[in-house]
Amino acid sequence: MKTFSAKASEASRKWWVIDARDQVLGKVAVKAANLLRGKEKTVFTPHVDTGDFVIVINANKVRLTGKKEEQKTFMSFSGYVGGHKSENVRARRVRHPELLVERAVRGMIPHNRLGRRVYRKLKVYSGDSHPHAAQQPEVVKLTGK
């Protein structure tokens, strides 16, 4: 019996919607990363993009555990003297709420060419509407609160 290896051209792609309202950020990110990579399919092959498209809505209402809202900081550096900037999750949520989910999912997929291709299939929106109704996405139910 030969080992099966999927081909990216033969992969069937579905569209999924994850509602992040009152869901823990890590649980949303794990589910999105697994769907993006195709880990929940029987034809999963680690070096081939067999994953689906994922839409995450209500990214501004995602929940964080503990005191991360005030204590977790995002650092950036412009390259200039005195160019260090930092902001906590609360400030980041006001400016760019979708970046919280995008960064969490990005950390859970491979950091290589395949990971970049997979990451492009993630669509994150801060509101409860999205422009992908024509793709007829299916709703993903997350367990727990």
Question: Across the structure, where does each feature detected by a protein language model lie?
Answer:
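Ribosome large-subunit tunnel/peptidyl-transferase-proximal elements
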Residues: 1-103, 113, 126, 131-145
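Short conserved catalytic/interaction loops centered on acidic-Pro-aromatic/His motifs
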Residues: 112-118
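Hydrophobic, well-ordered secondary-structure segments
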Residues: 101-102, 106, 119
